[in-house]
């Protein structure tokens, strides 16, 4: 539920940024632009949270630190990987402004949503299996 609201808020901000807001600050940004690729990375990070943290927590239900630190490390690595492509020649299109390369952006967003849904369902099922084995 919280992930859904966060993703909805991010989607609204991305659409607002892609359609209405246009400034030199956004055009000369060295980091990732607010576009559908960035939104797909948010879906991926939430999927990783569900897999690494939630899945790891329900293995023991009392060791919260290890899955949290593991998720933070994985999240940082994914963020670095997501920020890198638009600095690599030939991959600049993932950092498109506005509706430039919209088909690529939508395909990347669709991939992020599918990965999020699959990983979340698998993580949920695994967490339920682990939770049944835990003696609380």
Q: Which residues make up each language-model segment?
A:
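Hydrophobic alpha-helical transmembrane segments of membrane proteins
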Residues: 2-136
